[in-house]
A protein has these predicted regions:
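Catalytic cores of large soluble enzymes that bind and process phosphate-bearing ligands
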Residues: 5, 25-32, 62, 66, ...
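Conserved protein kinase catalytic core
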Residues: 18, 202, 267-269
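An N-terminal, well-structured beta->alpha segment
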Residues: 1-74, 80, 159-189
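Gly/Ser/Thr-enriched, mixed-charge loops and adjacent short helices
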Residues: 121-249
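Short, compositionally biased "basic patch" segments
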Residues: 1-22, 132-152, 259-261
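N-terminal small/polar loop signature for handling phosphorylated ligands or for N-terminal nucleophile
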Residues: 42, 46, 50, 56-122, ...
């Protein structure tokens, strides 16, 4: 029997999803994800005062090696409760939240399969409603529900659909940038921007957001998803990671560098001189702009 409570990590679910690291037994399996997703469907339905069959929930993942199997477990759990399930495939955490409010989507909830910047063998689940991410107490309640669920069979796979979320989310971001700059359809023409996606899910930002707006992204690095994370630790707060984007900017003669973690909810920046802006300095810079 799965000890669901041990998988809580604050407002997320986290665990070891793959073997291969000494002393770290697998704790987050597709079967556990199945049970937790069933619980989320029931929890969300109760909060909204509807049946699980009335729900639409999106599921996305980052580039982790265990992502496809864990995401499949989540979708199967949602389907087992009768919910409609939008398969978002490779996605970012911010995009998964936006799936609950973005025009044309407006889903009831979303699940992101990610362990953020943690090592390759870890994975986890982040949950969203239209009000934002679930909080610690919500996760405790959800995991308690999971521990009491009776067995369930397979759901109706016809209620799973390909979502196309990242295309819509990328268009949304392009619109925000164009509106903010106010310079036509290619406001970034003549600007060279390097993106370091850390082999996570952030390559879309270079190829689907910046490049269509006219930016030169030729100096970008580690855009291809690879759950082994061969380039560096996928964490903008890591010294080796920041050295990677700084090198790309300086050697590429870029105007700006951007670096993301695996699920694209952490970022750092580097200016043309190699000056780093991350954590408090990035917040201070954004505050000055606002």
């Amino acid at each position: 029997m799965t000890d669901y409570a041990r998988l809580q990590n604050g407002s997320d679910v986290r665990g070891v999803a793959l073997p291969g690291v000494a002393g770290e037994a697998v704790t987050l399996t597709p079967e556990a994800a199945f049970g937790i997703a069933r619980a989320f469907a029931r929890w969300l339905a109760a909060k909204k005062g509807v049946s699980p069959q009335a729900l639409t929930v999106g599921v996305g993942r980052d580039s982790r090696l265990s992502g496809p199997a864990i995401a499949a477990g989540v979708m199967e759990g949602l389907l087992a409760e009768g919910a409609r399930c939008g398969d978002c495939a490779m996605a970012s955490t911010p995009a998964m939240f936006m799936s609950t409010v973005l025009p044309g989507f407006g889903w009831d909830g979303a699940v992101m399969v990610t362990a953020s910047h943690l090592p390759w063998n870890r994975n986890g689940l982040k949950f969203f409603t239209r009000q934002g991410g679930l909080e610690n107490a919500d996760i405790r309640e959800l995991l308690a529900i999971a521990g009491e669920l009776p067995a369930a069979g397979a759901g109706d796979t016809d209620r799973r659909f390909e979502a196309g979320l990242m295309e819509a989310y990328s268009a949304h971001l392009r619109g925000i940038i164009c509106q903010g700059i106010g310079a036509g359809e290619q406001p970034l023409a003549g600007i060279k921007i390097a993106v370091d996606a850390g082999n996570g899910a952030g390559g879309f930002f270079a190829r689907q957001v910046l490049q269509p707006l006219g930016a030169d992204i030729s100096a970008s690095v580690l855009l291809e998803p690879d759950g082994h994370f061969p380039g560096h630790i996928p964490n903008p707060e890591d010294k080796a990671a920041m050295a990677s984007i700084r090198q790309a900017v300086i050697e590429g003669g870029c105007d700006l560098g951007l670096i993301f973690d695996t699920d694209v909810d952490r970022a750092g920046a580097v200016d043309r001189n190699g000056q780093e802006f991350c954590r408090n300095r990035l917040i201070a810079l954004m505050s000055a702009i606002v």
